[in-house]
């Protein structure tokens, strides 16, 4: 009888261990959740375009005025903004209202900014077309600035195509870029922010989204394609 009891106990133990092992195998892991083909194939319903496709869409059209935002569009300028925050207002974004910060940012701190590859491709394309290139930024205007030279040097923009940077500034409840897009008769405007795209839409021109890098200090990241605009692939760098 004792042997039978021991045998039954052993069987029960084996069953329990086997059940536990199966549970461990079949239970999803929160650390390694895995994926499947459907998830891998899922894409956001966005109007993606390439630089080559944009160039092709302009075939046969005469030279025109085109505009670019600066920060997170043609330059990854977070290093300068990060330094400004640490220097002037570590616990808030008040540095953005400090003229001393803008004097630094507009007069040298863009030496720490990284030119974006997508901007190189776009600007090269527009230079080949003979287009007039403008940069319209929401930065505050300062008495002097070296941003125009920095951009011209970094992107090798000939003087015939380059225009001085337009410092539109930032005003509450107002998209300050609209008047400049209209005044300069721009036909395309590239930008990373919602304001860039809505400025183009308000002017009835083509607004094209460039992706903001995930490690930009400018948060939250915008929802690219939310207005049905074209979004350039691989444009986060």
Swiss-Prot record:
Catalytic residues as annotated in Swiss-Prot or TrEMBL: 69 (nucleophile), 71 (proton donor)
Cofactor binding note of this UniProt entry: Binds 1 Mg(2+) ion per subunit.
Molecular functions per Gene Ontology: acid phosphatase activity; metal ion binding
Domain of life: Bacteria
Record InterPro entries: Acid_phosphat_B-like, HAD-like_sf, HAD-SF_ppase_IIIB_AphA, HAD_sf
Signal peptide: 1-23
Residues noted as binding Mg(2+) in the record, renumbered to the chain: 69, 71, 192
Catalytic activity: a phosphate monoester + H2O = an alcohol + phosphate
ATP-binding recorded as keyword: no
GO cellular component, one term: outer membrane-bounded periplasmic space
Keywords, comma-separated and alphabetical: Hydrolase, Magnesium, Metal-binding, Periplasm, Signal
UniProt KW Transmembrane keyword: no
Transmembrane segments annotated in the record for this chain: none
Binding site for substrate: 137-138, 177
Alphabetical list of Gene3D superfamilies matching this protein: HAD superfamily/HAD-like
Effect of residue 196 to N: 6-fold reduction in phosphatase activity. 10000-fold decrease in affinity for Mg(2+). 18-fold increase in KM for pNPP in presence of 1 mM MgCl(2). KM is 0.79 mM for pNPP in the presence of 10 mM MgCl(2)
EC number(s) per entry: 3.1.3.2
Cellular location(s): Periplasm
Family the UniProt entry places it in: Belongs to the class B bacterial acid phosphatase family.
The protein's role, per its UniProt record: Dephosphorylates several organic phosphate monoesters. Also has a phosphotransferase activity catalyzing the transfer of low-energy phosphate groups from organic phosphate monoesters to free hydroxyl groups of various organic compounds.
Quaternary structure and partners: Homotetramer.
Name of protein: Class B acid phosphatase
Organism, as annotated: Salmonella typhimurium
Taxon lineage: Bacteria, Pseudomonadati, Pseudomonadota, Gammaproteobacteria, Enterobacterales
């Amino acid at each position: 009888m004792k042997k039978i009891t021991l045998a039954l106990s052993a069987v029960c133990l084996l069953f329990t261990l086997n059940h536990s092992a199966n549970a461990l195998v079949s239970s999803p892991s929160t650390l390694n959740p895995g994926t499947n083909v459907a998830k891998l194939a899922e894409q956001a319903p966005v109007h993606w375009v390439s630089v080559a496709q944009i160039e092709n869409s302009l075939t046969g059209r005469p030279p025109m005025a085109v505009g670019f935002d600066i920060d997170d569009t043609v330059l990854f300028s977070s290093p300068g903004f990060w330094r400004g925050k640490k220097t002037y207002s570590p616990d808030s974004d008040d540095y953005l209202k400090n003229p001393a910060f803008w004097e630094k940012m507009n007069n040298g701190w863009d030496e720490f900014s990284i030119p974006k590859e997508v901007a190189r491709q776009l600007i090269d394309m527009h230079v080949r077309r003979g287009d007039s290139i403008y940069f319209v930024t929401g930065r505050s205007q300062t008495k002097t600035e070296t941003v125009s030279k920095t951009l011209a040097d970094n992107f090798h923009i000939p003087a015939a195509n380059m225009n001085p940077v337009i410092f539109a500034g930032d005003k509450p409840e107002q998209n300050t870029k609209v008047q400049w897009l209209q005044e300069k008769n721009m036909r395309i405007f590239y930008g990373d922010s919602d304001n860039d795209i809505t400025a183009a839409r308000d002017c009835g021109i083509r607004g094209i989204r460039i992706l903001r890098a995930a490690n930009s200090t400018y948060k939250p990241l915008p929802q690219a394609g939310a207005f049905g605009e074209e979004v350039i692939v691989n444009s986060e760098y």
